[in-house]
Amino acid sequence: MIKSSEIKKIVNDYSDVKIGVLGSHSALEVMDGAKDENFETTVFCQKGREGPYQRFNRIADQIVVLDKFKDMASAKNQKMLRDSNTIVVPHRSLTVYLGYKTIEEKFKVPIFGNRKLFQAEERTAKKGQYYLLEKARIKYPKLFKDPKRINKPCIVKVQEKKRPLERAFFTVSS
């Protein structure tokens, strides 16, 4: 795990902070909010996926086009992020494309939040997001493991086969 003291040292040298994000579907909202707060933004896109950021040119001050999303973690790009005083705002796609090991051990760029908690966001982790919600006494939707037990209106979330990061939703009542 990258020591927080290493990241603190990097952040202490920052002056005008910029916001960086991996350019998947979640990035548009993150960047729109960053612009609302008057931050400069950088988005890292996989080749062929830069279109939305070019169309909504208000939200991206800099678009970095990569061969693969995982290239965001290259030494060259990490240096560029640090040199430009960038804090990365993470979302699910960052952990999927860069991987936990890379983020925890190699990605020496400040991240908004706690890189130790990313794995806890997994639904399948022993002490994952549902465990944390229960510990915090935060209500969350009931999970039905057997569809035969559904006895009231429910929203069903289905992971798409061809696009593993995407989910389809529909409603049922029984």
Residue locations for each model-derived region?
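N-terminal phosphate-binding or glycine-rich loops at protein starts, especially the Walker A/P-loop
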Residues: 3-37
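Short N-terminal binding/cap micro-motifs at the start of the first secondary-structure element
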Residues: 27-32, 50-52, 164
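Anion (oxyanion) recognition and catalysis
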Residues: 35, 82, 105, 134
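Short internal beta-strands
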Residues: 39-48
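N-terminal beta-loop-helix "entrance" segment that forms/cooperates
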Residues: 48-65
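Short amphipathic alpha-helix with an adjacent loop that forms part of the alpha/beta core around
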Residues: 71-83
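A short, GP-enriched loop/loop-strand-helix hinge that lies immediately N-terminal to
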Residues: 84-124, 139-144
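Active-site nucleotide/adenylate-binding loops and adjacent lid/helix of ATP-dependent enzymes
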Residues: 118-174
